[in-house]
Amino acid sequence: MYSTNPGSWVTFDDDPAFQSSQKRKDFSLETQGVCRPNGLKLTLPTLRDPPSTPSSASSTPLSSPMVDFYFSPGPPSNSPLSTPTKDFPGFPGIPKAGTHVLYPIPECSSSSAPTTAGGVGPPLLLTKPDCSPHVSLPSSHSHTQPTPTLGFTEDAGPQRVQSEARQFEYFQDHCAFSNPFWKDEGSASPFPLDSLASRKPFSPKDKEVPIGHKSLTQCSLDYICEKLEHLHSAETQDPLGDLSMQDPYAGDTVSFVPHSLFRSQPRAGWSFMLRIPEKKNMMSSRQWGPIFLKVLPGGILQMYYEKGLEKPFKEFQLDPHCRLSEPKLENFSMAGKIHTVKVEHVSYSEKRKYHAKTEVVHEPEVEQMLKLGSTEHRDFLEFLTTVEEELIKLPATAKPKNKSYEEQEICLDIQDSLWGKVTKEGQLVESAVVTQICCLCFLNGPAECFLALNDRELQKRDECYFEKEPEKKGIAILDYHFHTCVKAEEFEQSRIIKFVPLDACRFELMRFKTSYEAGELPFAVKSVVTVQGAYVELQAFVNMTPAAQGSPHAGALRSCNNIMIHFPVPAQWIKALWTRNLQRQKSLKAKMNRRACLGSLQEPESEPVIQVTVGSAKYESAYRAVVWKIDRLPDKNSSPDQPHCLSYKLELGSDQEVPSDWYPFATVQFSMLEACASRTEVRSLGVESDAQPQKHVCQRACYNIQVEIEKKWIQVDGEDADKTGGCVTQ
């Protein structure tokens, strides 16, 4: 009746269709049967058979339902009790436990004519679900088949095989059992909390991989496994396949340190998540829905149901009153977290408050317009940068008539963003400072404002603005960009910024670029990773620099706030940073351990994987890195010169999980209030009137530093000496 192959695959020898298909010499790749991972090999009819062939001879009827013993609970997939459903559990295309997902039949391109059986009728195209190999869509073919059949057209054959191979690979990565024909690759991670968030949906437009022709029978299992191996190796060689080893700003066209005022790059769009319904409602719950998002010139947000559609289902026009909220990291599902941001509409109203002293204030009224999210950190940062740069390019709006304020006010917010690269020796080799000046005005009438900075060119032309400190040199403005309300011709002549501000609207007045002349950062970061066989240990040390400890500008010690240090983790190491239980998987987390301070003689009873002396550290799948968070430095409970350290130790399964071409960089982000990295100062601010409004100037500096991690490779017995590369060998 049947015979078993050495690979535990069962084939029916008495099936006439199977015997006849083996005798055919022209049995091509497009017409072969596909091996199913449930232990059965189904032999399927060819599309080139003549129409006179009876349908009963092309398949084997099933007298009883085929039970899938691995995907329980639920009735058999081909029984009347099984109802195919399609749901969105958090990630597109990933079904919930106990459900079966039916995927639609891809449409053929209009340029290629599909071929059918006998040349008549629609093409017979069926796709295999990811997690349920027995469920398939019914065909609209004229001949009724008792069992589902699978075929490929001549034009879409290679793409179809590639789709099948990728679905089989996904099935391999996330199943609870193994198969002797599946090869365990180091880059495959069986932990869904990171792999599902980083996996991209398959697109039929992906590039095809050339496969060498071998003297193998095309309907044999070895041929199928050979093709899957080639497809898998092509994916691992894709430079965009493993994002865990890439920096958010790494690439050929984008550098970590910006070389211009505008850092956004032309993009066709991003795959985002939209919070629906858009506004909170007491009668309904909100959920995430997948969309494809585009940002057009002029501040137009276009949202599509999926990539490739011609017309968007929604358009949103940004106006000068719109702004982006602070980015947050929120729980998405069991598969990890999501980066979220809100598009808000902000308006201001004047109110009188009665406290111990009566005062008039201008309070903002915030209305949420959209809430967007993304599981890809790099796409999320690109979207934020693009929207911020589109807002400064919007035209100015006219002020409403007959609107007056009881209390006039001008507020300036100066923010410096420092971008720099630091070598493993601690030297700052590349840096740039981009300064953004935001303005908020409440003025009566069409008043014209003026602003004078400590510009070096202004110091040469008019020294009256530098009478108090004539020996202090001004800053060199390398490049600048103004809002549309600024009179650019006046600035070229007098180096004084004159503008007619927007009424009750916070807008970016100008941005300019300067060089970082301080020469020393507020604190230094030193990172070392040691590899010895399959044992990996990373150590990071943080200490305040002498310049930050003795700041001459303020009596109190300036502090660095909201410090985040990201240490990238290769995909092969993720499984060592997760713990499992019956309910879920969770990341290993380390909080402040006083006994792990430098110079301490006490050792903990059980040594954890991650240790820190201040703050907290854990693996964040949203960043694909170990994130060390510190609220404030210097710490309140330690002296300013006290160094702090982080250490995490991993015992990998094999030394093959350590990539030899891994050159990691740690990313450091923090902010300082009442600080200035560009040395920008306001020399004069006011309006062309005798009655001057109240003036408020706030300054802060945001630092983004990329630090090179030193690699030390300790060679063990039997290890290839060439694997260490340029690392230090002890």
From Swiss-Prot:
Biological processes annotated in GO: endocytosis; focal adhesion assembly; focal adhesion disassembly; platelet-derived growth factor receptor signaling pathway; regulation of endocytosis; ruffle assembly; substrate-dependent cell migration
The entry's keywords: Cytoplasm, Endocytosis, Membrane
Residue span of region Disordered: 1-26, 38-83, 132-159
Classification via SUPFAM superfamilies: Second domain of Mu2 adaptin subunit (ap50) of ap2 adaptor
Positions with biased composition (Low complexity): 54-65, 132-143
Location(s) in or outside the cell: Cytoplasm; Membrane
Main location: cytoplasm
Pfam families, per the entry: Adap_comp_sub
Annotated function: May be involved in the endocytic machinery.
Miscellaneous remark of the record: In contrast to other members of the family, it does not contain NPF (Asn-Pro-Phe) sites and thereby does not interact with EPS15, EPS15R and ITSN1.
Family as reported in the entry's similarity comment: Belongs to the Stoned B family.
Name listed for the protein in its UniProt record: Stonin-1
Record organism: Mus musculus (Mouse)
